[in-house]
């Protein structure tokens, strides 16, 4: 069967992946309400396009934290790519870079910072958590900067771990031979095995539940790299991020994997854009599956969108080429949608374009 959209890739990936890996990638917290709502929010809005406008020359290029991008799109941080394909993050970084897109490397990667930057052909951001061991956090920041990462993405919505019941039932753990490569040489490179989710036990033992805004300032003081705060769904937190040294926020609910019944990211995006004003760049993730989804997010004020799970579906189906095809599909759909909205470029996408159904 020809794979012609991202839903096709998900269906194909489910057939290829072991159940434990597929459930880990695809699941949400508890009843998965937020997971579903992230998608449904796009379907609740229609595009009120304009006609008889010259769209013969279109530009989709963007600039994120000073870094040029061929699209207003970046690869969102996700853990454990080698569950999907033996080359893991090496393949996803290469596919994104070859298309002029930013790749965000997770702290919880199965390839190290240095390995990924060695093969990356485009800009890389580094996502991190604040560990109870601040020295370990500092070391990761220093390694990311030394390797050539362009920004730090601090995940702030996982101080404690959301309950993903599929992982609990599957007793999720990393298969033999896979480790958290950025933490090799420490006792934290392997996930525990046993009853329940090994990842849940890992997070609860290592991540600092006392994380607060002072830690954002501390992180910014460690480096000249811009700091992105990822996991914001309330406008007042965007204001706080600006006041404590962040350069950008990602409107995100962790893909519906942390607090179930949290709002869909598209629903809260406009209020956060308004609160941020010109003090922060605002990006968003959650539920992006079509070019029209990207148009809606941009029209409501996002500078760019993060794409997560579909990247892993592409990786599982056909490695680097699969990731590349997923990104190419989104590029083609976005270009077509922008034109059909009567826009010649991203600057022509305004809030009036997006209306409730």
What are these regions (language model features)?
Residues 80, 94, 115, 119, ...:
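Alpha/beta enzyme core
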Residues 1-46, 267-357:
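Alpha/beta catalytic cores of nucleotide-metabolism and tRNA/nucleoside-modifying enzymes
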């Amino acid at each position: 069967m020809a794979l012609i959209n991202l839903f096709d890739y998900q269906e194909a990936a489910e057939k290829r992946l072991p159940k434990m890996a597929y459930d880990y990638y695809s699941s949400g917290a508890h009843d998965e309400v937020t997971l579903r709502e992230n998608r449904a929010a796009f379907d609740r809005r229609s595009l009120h396009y304009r006609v008889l406008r010259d769209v013969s020359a279109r530009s989709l290029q963007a600039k994120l934290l000073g870094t040029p991008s061929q699209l207003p799109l970046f690869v969102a941080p996700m853990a454990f790519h080698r569950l999907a394909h033996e080359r893991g993050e090496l393949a996803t970084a290469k596919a994104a870079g070859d298309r002029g897109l930013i790749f965000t490397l997770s702290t919880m990667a199965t390839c190290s910072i240095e390995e990924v930057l060695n093969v990356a052909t485009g800009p890389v951001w580094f996502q991190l958590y604040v560990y109870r061991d601040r020295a370990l956090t500092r070391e990761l920041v220093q390694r990311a900067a030394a390797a050539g990462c362009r920004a730090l993405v601090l995940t702030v919505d996982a101080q404690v771990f959301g309950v993903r019941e599929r992982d609990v039932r599957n007793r999720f753990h990393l298969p033999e031979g896979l480790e958290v490569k950025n933490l090799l040489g420490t006792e934290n490179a392997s996930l525990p095995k046993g009853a329940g989710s090994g990842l849940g036990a890992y997070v609860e033992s290592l991540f600092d539940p006392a994380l607060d805004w002072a830690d954002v300032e501390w992180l910014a003081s460690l480096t000249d790299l811009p700091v992105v705060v990822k996991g914001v769904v309330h406008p007042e937190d965007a204001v706080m991020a600006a006041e404590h040294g962040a350069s950008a926020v990602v409107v995100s609910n962790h893909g519906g994997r942390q607090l179930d019944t949290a709002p869909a990211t598209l629903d809260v995006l406009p209020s956060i854009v308004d609160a941020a004003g010109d003090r922060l760049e605002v990006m968003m993730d959650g539920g992006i599956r079509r070019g029209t989804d990207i148009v809606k997010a941009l029209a409501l004020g996002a500078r760019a969108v993060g794409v997560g799970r579909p990247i892993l579906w592409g990786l599982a189906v056909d490695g680097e080429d699969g990731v590349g095809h997923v990104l190419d599909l989104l590029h083609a759909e976005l270009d077509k949608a922008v034109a059909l909205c009567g826009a010649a470029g991203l600057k022509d996408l305004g809030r009036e374009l997006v209306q409730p159904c």
